[in-house]
Amino acid sequence: MKDRRLVHRLSRADPDALRQIYHRYKDDLLTVAMALLADPDAAEDCVHDVFVHFAGAPADMRADRNLKGYLMRCVANRAKNLIKRQQLQPVHQIDEPDYAGEQDCPEGRLIVSEESMRIFEAMAKLPCEQREVVSLHIHGQMKFREIAEQLEVSINTVQSRYRYGIEKLRTFL
């Protein structure tokens, strides 16, 4: 079912519509929240807070907007607010990633876990604007144009934040 139809059904208090939206986008949203917060519990709380707000006010979303992009932006904003309000420091403790095959042996689990840890630590060192753009582009699979629209900045700004963020990640890793 198309997103617009689901949002319309949600505005008519259809709980199944919210359930479908949640299951369609929760993994992508959790990935972005985790990349921004580096704390699995805080990331999950962030996504749930966004869905609670969205369920209470689906009319806030303009009909012409991309639902996934809108929810990604809500998660990014919520994560930034958590960081500002609580001065949330990344915990650097992550759940074991689920990479099939690589975790079949203890060495594979250790390598995957160490790589994930290094990436999350490096992401946490980026300035918030760069971390947001890198997360939305890589983890959220959003195009630069979509990110620019959601952040309400120029596409050149998004591209430069991404470029500088990636350059810094390379130096950190």
Could you say what each language-model-derived stretch is?
Residues 133-137:
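A short pre-motif secondary-structure segment
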Residues 89-116:
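Internal acidic/polar
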Residues 25, 161-164:
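Residues within the DNA-recognition helix of helix-turn-helix
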Residues 59-63, 73-93, 112:
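Arg/Lys-rich amphipathic alpha helix in sigma70-family domain 2
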Residues 1-28, 35, 124, 171:
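N-terminal module of bacterial RNA polymerase sigma factors
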Residues 33, 84, 131, 166-173:
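Short, Lys/Arg-enriched C-terminal cap helix and immediately downstream tail that follows
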Residues 11-12, 48-66, 86:
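Sigma70-family region 2
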Residues 31, 45-52, 65-77:
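Structural recognition of an alpha-helix C-terminal capping motif at a helix-to-coil junction
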